[in-house]
Amino acid sequence: SYTLRALKSGESTDISGLYADWAEALEWQSGQLSIQYNSTDGTGWIGWYDGETQWCLSAGDGADAPLVNTAYSIMQTLGYDVDVAPEGASDVVYSAEPRDGLAVASCAFTLDGVRWTYSMAATSQVELPFQDISGLPDYAVTEDAQILWCPAVISYDESGAGKITWFDVAPGLVYSLSADNSAGRDALLDMANRLFTPAQGEVG
């Protein structure tokens, strides 16, 4: 079961009413929303704060869908612009997990028979080389690339499976985009440019 709460507030705050030693405790940004996620084996809560209102969705035992994905559906219903999947995408799933010390928020979707995963994480590391948050090994071919003004690394193989990672230094955000098959270098670059919305707006 789920419980949804809301509170007018001057700052982000925990309104879940739940207290535990959580296995996962993550925070990240999605557009203008500050998001907090605390979970153990799928039970826990996710909160989002828009500068005026704190929302919180909590899940108990037996919740019938992943908590993060359910919360993103509610955010969209409430009118928040958090949908990063392109038009025509299907099987869209939102998730969050700790990875190499960072809180990685991801959106997986299927488009034209290819399964894509787009991820983002905030980092305090500003020097190169930047962190790879894809969770995937390098493929047969690895090259330097660029997404807008951001340094990028692209890696792929003959089947079209691959990944591209990039770093936007001003807001301190690292990104990754991966494809399971039939994509290749050009498709990875095209999709990355299509999905990437700079946190600071267009620059230069």
Put a short name on every predicted segment.
Residues 51-84, 171-204:
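Surface-exposed amphipathic alpha-helical segments
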Residues 1-51, 81-173:
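Short, solvent-exposed recognition patches
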